[in-house]
Amino acid sequence: MKFRGHAHRSMDAKGRLMLTPEYRDQVYSDSPDGCVTLTIFEGNIVGFTPPDWAILEEKLTSIKSPSRKLRNFIRIIISGSEEVSLDKQGRITIPSYLRKSGKLDKDVVLAGVGDRFEIWDKREYEALLEQDFDDVSDELAECGVELPF
């Protein structure tokens, strides 16, 4: 896994957000110029390094005969994406339309999810943590994943 853990961060009025040192290292290992592609999904901003974004984009655009709903979904994900670069201080600038879509305020949470990281409004992330996940073990088992705990 590439991106793990979570961190509370503050975003400034210009939308600049400092990534954690571990996330910055991962970005630079996949993209020497420090590029990240951001898009919106499920109410949060999702960040991909160029190789992982290319894989996702290829998968989405190679779907044969997608339904209208799926075409619209793909359209929103790809057309709503923006490539940004880390600045000298290790910050990314989140475009205003993505900040608005993600309902991001000053206080945010970075959450590592393997091949990507997510940027959540702090209140939304805390609400996510309050959800009851007891019933997901059955769904995981159906997918062939048995949790050892």
From Swiss-Prot:
Main subcellular localisation: cytoplasm
One cellular component term from this protein's GO annotations in UniProt: nucleoid
Cross-referenced Gene3D superfamilies: Transcriptional regulator MraZ domain
Annotated compartments: Cytoplasm, Nucleoid
GO molecular function: DNA-binding transcription factor activity; transcription cis-regulatory region binding
Domain SpoVT-AbrB: 6-52, 81-124
GO BP field: negative regulation of DNA-templated transcription initiation
Keyword Transcription: yes
One Pfam short name: MraZ
Keywords annotated in UniProt: Cytoplasm, DNA-binding, Repeat, Transcription, Transcription regulation
The keyword Acetylation is assigned to this record: no
InterPro entries in the record: MraZ (IPR003444), MraZ_C (IPR035644), MraZ_dom (IPR020603), MraZ_N (IPR035642), MraZ_sf (IPR038619), SpoVT-AbrB_dom (IPR007159), SpoVT-AbrB_sf (IPR037914)
PROSITE patterns: SPOVT_ABRB (PS51740)
Subunit structure of this chain's protein: Forms oligomers.
Similarity comment: Belongs to the MraZ family.
Record protein name field: Transcriptional regulator MraZ
Lineage per the UniProt record: Bacteria, Pseudomonadati, Thermodesulfobacteriota, Desulfovibrionia, Desulfovibrionales
